[in-house]
Each structure stands twice: as C-alpha cells, then as structure tokens.
Amino acid sequence: MLKSYQEINAETIDRWIEEGWEWGQPISHETYLNAKNGNWNVLLTPVNPVPHEWFGNLKDKKILGLASGGGQQMPIFVALGANCTVLDYSDKQLEAEKMVAEREKYEIEIIKADMTKKLPFADNSFDIIFHPVSNSYIEKVEPVFKECYRILKKGGILLCGLDIGTNYTVDEKEEKIINSLPFNPLVNEEQRKQLEEQDCGIQFSHTISEQIGGQLKAGFRLTDIYDDTNGFGRLHELNIASFVATRAIKE
C-alpha cells in the first residue's frame, strides 16, 4: 500500500530531527526558567519573534499548538501559566514535547494526528491556536482554517506562520527563478523530482488568497500581520520576505 504524502512528510521530519533540524530541538531548562521569570520569545516564522501583545495574559488560557511539536513553544506557554495541548504528525516532534514536560514536571496533552483531517476536539475548545510554519506540508489549507474556527472559543485567537511561496520559485542557491507557481509535486513530476533530490519531503506553495483569504472566509477577522525572511541564504540577504505571520480573531 502506497504511503500518503502526509506519512512521507512525518517520516521525513523525523529523519531531519535525527540529523539536527533546528525546528526539532527542544528548549533548555534555562530557557524554561527564564520564561517563568517573564523573559521569553516564541517564533511563528524563522526570524522575527511574535509580539507579546498578540497573546495577552496566558494564565489559565487553553492553547493548542497545531503542528507545533518539538518542545520549543509549548513549554514557554506552560511556563507562562497556560494549559496546553500539542498536535503533530511527527513522532520525534511529539517525543520532544514529552521529554521537556517530564524534565520540567508539567502536564501537557500530546496528540498524534493529521491536521488535514477533522481535528479531534469539540467545538469552542481553545482560547488560542498557535500554528507556526507547517501548512507548506499540506495540499489544501482552507479546511484547516475552518477547523480552527470551529474549535476556537468566541473571541479566540489564531496565530499563524505562513510561507507565501517565494521559496518554491528559486533554485537551491536562490539565484535563478526555476519554477512557476503553484508548486505542487502531486501534479507536477518535475517538482516532485526536485524535492526528492533535496530530501525535502512533499511540500506545497500557497498563495496569500488561500492563506489569509482562507482565514477570512472561515469567519476570522485579521487584526495584525508582519513579514519575515528565511533567516539565511540569498533571499534573506536581499531582505526578500518569504513568510508572513498573522493574528486573527473569531468574533
């Protein structure tokens, strides 16, 4: 039986983590203690930290980390007094969450699930959903935003990190434009070969219309946005944005 692209991506990310992938390295005990003392930052996108005012007071808030495993953000939110749930499809990312929780002696609900399916939560379950860059690993993003709207409480906040597609147009050195958009290896054999050669799993470009428009169509009101770069490489050096972070509210 052929593996789904979601399974291929989970296995790819597990392998990257074993090789030292930066987004799979859990925070240190010192970083956790600093957060408890009010000194903290978290990332939705590679470089620019999320403004603290996007969150408000996190004490006793119910937060879902959506495709947010790795032991990087959830421990910070716990340190700030939140009740956290993390959902991811990578075993290694979830193992990191469990490791930090055991080390720091706190409770967190850890769920392995595919976010392209109906999310395993009741309506109106969460105050905040924290969704860092990850939807580039799924083909259709609009259903995810609809599910986020369903499971957020009225007045709840959706925080997203979004790849806006620039990365999928250029070669590895980021010197030449080699691809048209959309980038979809499920329908474009040449794009699939590119990903295979670079061990990049199965990735997809998504437009602003899909991602921000998708949030608006789901019922959200956009309240703030900022852009960001890759953090390295030629596009970064030229200050060409590859990501946006968004804050939206369920009214």
Show which residues each predicted segment covers.
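A short SAM/SAH-binding and catalytic strip from SAM-dependent methyltransferases
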Residues: 127-142
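A short acidic, Gly/Pro-enriched loop at the edge of an enzyme's catalytic core
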Residues: 116-128
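Conserved class I S-adenosyl-L-methionine
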Residues: 157-190
